[in-house]
């Protein structure tokens, strides 16, 4: 009885030690099922492709969507963020992904309620959507647009998630796909102008972009001003006669 009472605690301790060791190595060995191991991508966003040459992502992008595709280009999943955490310059989006190579396709502005573009050829099943089928289309009215477009941003990044249990840090750089153009007219003789006396339009075949952000021909779109008016800009040489201008602002997809 005394020998048994000594052996049992030793056996118990041995089993506990074995369980602890197995728990420690289960996420690091290639011989075990790794589907439950924590790994993926810790993704930061950067929008410095602008005239300020600084990261304006926290100030300019109010919602972001990341579409994930595997090494063969098949759709894996989508991650959205629409909250105020995007205002934090240190914000990172966590993507839980198994080991492998992925393409991350990101759009800023699509998940916002006031968005001006739609994703087409997009389905929820990975077997149904390939990255080459992805397109973003301007929401227009019979190829006419006279609204201030909600800003659209684009970015793409290739990333590899290793087998070890960790989140790979990466940065996805974005560019802006919308423009706000202000046209100003002024008489050389200083006489006042009325904006309603003029017709302001911009035409371009630029309503659709593919997964590489290249413009795809879908037909000419006519852009009209979303606002017009007149403004005083100073006085003439006599110091009394006001000088005014007529202006119009148009919002377009990438030119």
Residue ranges of predicted features:
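Bacterial Sec-dependent N-terminal signal peptides
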Residues: 2-3, 20-48
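Structural motif
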Residues: 47-59, 185-193
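Tryptophan-paired
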Residues: 64-118, 193-255
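Short, low-hydrophobicity acidic/polar segments
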Residues: 77-176
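A sequence/structural signal for flexible, mid-protein segments enriched
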Residues: 142-237
């Amino acid at each position: 009885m005394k020998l048994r009472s000594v052996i049992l605690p030793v056996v118990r301790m041995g089993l506990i030690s074995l369980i602890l060791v197995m728990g420690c190595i289960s996420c690091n060995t290639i011989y075990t099922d790794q589907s439950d191991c924590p790994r993926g991508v810790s993704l930061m966003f950067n929008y410095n492709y602008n005239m300020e040459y600084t990261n304006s992502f926290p100030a300019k992008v109010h919602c972001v969507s990341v579409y994930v595709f595997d090494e063969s280009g098949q759709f894996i999943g989508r991650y959205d963020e629409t909250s105020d955490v995007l205002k934090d310059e240190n914000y990172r989006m966590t993507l839980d992904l198994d080991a492998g190579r992925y393409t991350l396709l990101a759009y800023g502005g699509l998940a916002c309620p006031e968005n001006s573009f739609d994703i087409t050829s997009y389905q929820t099943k990975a077997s149904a959507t390939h990255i080459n089928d992805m397109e973003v289309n301007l929401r227009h009215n019979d190829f006419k647009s006279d609204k201030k477009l909600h800003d659209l941003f684009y970015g793409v990044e290739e990333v590899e998630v290793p087998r070890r249990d960790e989140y790979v840090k990466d940065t996805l750089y974005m560019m802006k796909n919308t423009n706000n153009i202000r046209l100003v007219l002024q008489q050389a003789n200083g006489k006042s102008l009325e904006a309603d006396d003029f017709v302001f339009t911009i035409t371009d075949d630029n309503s659709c972009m593919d997964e590489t952000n290249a413009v795809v021909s879908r037909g000419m779109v006519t852009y009209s001003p979303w606002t017009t008016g007149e403004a005083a800009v100073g006085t003439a040489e006599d110091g009394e006669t006001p000088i005014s201008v007529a202006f119009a602002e148009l919002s377009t997809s990438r030119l």
